[in-house]
Amino acid sequence: METAIEDAGLDRGPTLTSSWDAACGALTQSLFLTRTGPRAQDLDFEQLLAPPAQGPDLVSLKSSLSPRDENPCFIYLKCGPNGGEEILSVGILSSARNMEVYLGEEYCGTSRGKNVCTVLDNSEHEKILLYKKYLKLESPTHACKIKLLSFGEEQCVLISKVVVHLRPRSAKPSPSSPALGSRIDLDNIQTIMESMGSKLSPGAQQLMDMIRFQQQNCLPIRDQLQSVLGTAGHKHLMALQSSPSSGVVDKASSTPFPFRTGLTPSAITENLKALIDKSTQPSGEGNTTNHNECHLMPQNHSLESDLKNAVSSFLPKKASGSSSVPNSELLPFLQNLCSQVNHLRVGHNARWQENVSKPREGTVGVPLEEQPVCSYLEKILSKNMEVMEKKLMKHIDERIYQLQEHIDAKMALLVDLLRSPNSPSPGMPLRHYDSRERLSNGER
């Protein structure tokens, strides 16, 4: 393996820019590129991020806005369009203590800095601590942005070195993304929460149990939804199209689910309530079902929220095992709902009667007509999972930052007390001191 550290003045090298003000061309001088072969191993960033022997040339990044305005410091890395290279990992030696890496708007990871050395800022004549931090990306990319984090809302960040690990862009397509939730280490998250004295809410615990079950069974969300919804009832769909009451249905309509006009919330709610009421009736009262009409509404009524409310009202009951709705009647209801969603006709005067399908034995794969529904539900669950993971990681990072600040303040206070002339000699016992502070879990 050949490794070479080069200056950033190459034509094919990535460009380095910042959201804060810097001297023209000064930021590019701090960029160092490390190119390796396609099968390269991890680099030794401990050595690459070591400060230069002759003293680092610091590049100053300053915010042009007032401290009251929220203006984080971002630096942007982007490979050339014709360079044929991709970024594997990135490391920074700067006065910012931590950094966060984003691929577009997606959070990739956080790297906490390690104190390397103390240098003297020539402009301010102050001692500056430099921290080195690096992060290996989960998947290679041609561009990323890095958020530099400093304590105390610093309006100036000094950068000594930016090291980027590059390799030739692979001709093979990137592998498919892992199953939903497979990258989440639930045991590690729960251990961190317990060590901080916090407990998960019942809703968060239920969500983690669902993710753990999905990880253990290695089933994609699409397969799980298909196992719940079962067959769409292709024969039932043909019966709907051939029946006189369903003549208004447009057979050629193939508009995807998210952009189709919506069902009224009352229609979905009444259907679900009627099904539950029917299941709770005594067996002697018969088994009759009222046919409710489904009305088409304008585009401003969201079908997405209606469907999410209907499905969310069903899922907790089914998961808890306390639902009285029999599966033989619940499955046809969901199948009919999916068929109606996929075959609605855009129009203000169009109405059609909902048919009740017979219970079907067993479940098979969802045909092509229902694929938009499963795909849309999968996107909703994936988005909620990503939002939960980001919020949890942000909360953990904030708590760790607060803990670091607290420890640093106490250590500085302890050092000052030991250096003061009134401090006791090493041979004398120390007096007991109670700060009266309590931990978050109530212990002292």
From Swiss-Prot:
The keyword Mitochondrion applies. Residues 431-444 have a biased composition (Basic and acidic residues). Residues 424-444 are annotated as: Disordered. One of its GO terms (cellular component) is cytoplasm. It is an enzyme of class 3 (hydrolase). PANTHER family: ATPASE PAAT (PTHR14787:SF1), C10ORF188 FAMILY MEMBER (PTHR14787). This is ATPase PAAT. It comes from Rattus norvegicus (Rat). The lineage of its organism: Eukaryota, Metazoa, Chordata, Craniata, Vertebrata.
